[in-house]
Amino acid sequence: MLSCWVLLLALLGGACALPAPLGYSQALAQAVDSYNQRPEVQNAFRLLSADPEPGPNVQLSSLHNLNFTIMETRCQARSGAQLDSCEFKEDGLVKDCAAPVVLQGGRAVLDVTCVDSMADPVRVKRVWPLVIRTVIAGYNLYRAIKKK
């Protein structure tokens, strides 16, 4: 009888010792940290955006992939600094990342893959304002010549 109680207590104690399931925001932070641990990463990267954005209605268990964008900061990758306190680097690299979500025993195993972002908002050149100014200048020149 005593062995049954010991077995029951061991089972209940083991169930209580299981780690809490990983949340979506925690999984994103873990994925960014995983990328920052790579040897080729000099400056740490910080989360720029995620799809979907973190919120109370987003469950990690319902996702097949983590899709997010990171940007280079001014902090060294392995300096131990809090990423939230690191400023984004001006003209820093922007990377689009994906990580398949594989849940093993309530824990997420993430294999992060990142590529350089094609849409770098810093380097976008706007052509239309230049075209409009050129047309207006040409029209004004035409009117000035026509008056003479």
Curated annotation (Swiss-Prot):
Keywords: Antibiotic, Antimicrobial, Disulfide bond, Immunity, Innate immunity, Secreted, Signal
Swiss-Prot/TrEMBL GO biological process terms: antibacterial innate immune response; antimicrobial humoral immune response mediated by antimicrobial peptide; defense response to Gram-negative bacterium; defense response to Gram-positive bacterium; innate immune response; macrophage activation; positive regulation of adaptive immune response; positive regulation of cytokine production involved in inflammatory response
Entry's Gene Ontology molecular function annotations: lipopolysaccharide binding
Intracellular or extracellular location(s): Secreted
Propeptide regions on this chain: 18-122
Tissues with expression: Detected in gizzard, liver, small intestine, large intestine, cloaca, bursa of Fabricius, gall bladder, lung, trachea, kidney, testis and bone marrow.
Gene Ontology CC: one annotated term: extracellular space
Cleaved signal peptide residues: 1-17
Cited InterPro entries: Cathelicidin-like, Cystatin_sf
Disulfide bond annotation, renumbered to this chain: C75-C86, C97-C114
Record Pfam families: Cathelicidins
SUPFAM superfamilies in the record: Cystatin/monellin
Origin superkingdom: Eukaryota
Function description: Binds bacterial lipopolysaccharide (LPS). Has potent antimicrobial activity against Gram-positive and Gram-negative bacteria (in vitro). Has hemolytic activity (in vitro). May play a role in the innate immune response.
Stated family: Belongs to the cathelicidin family.
Name listed for the protein in its UniProt record: Cathelicidin-1
Organism: Gallus gallus (Chicken)
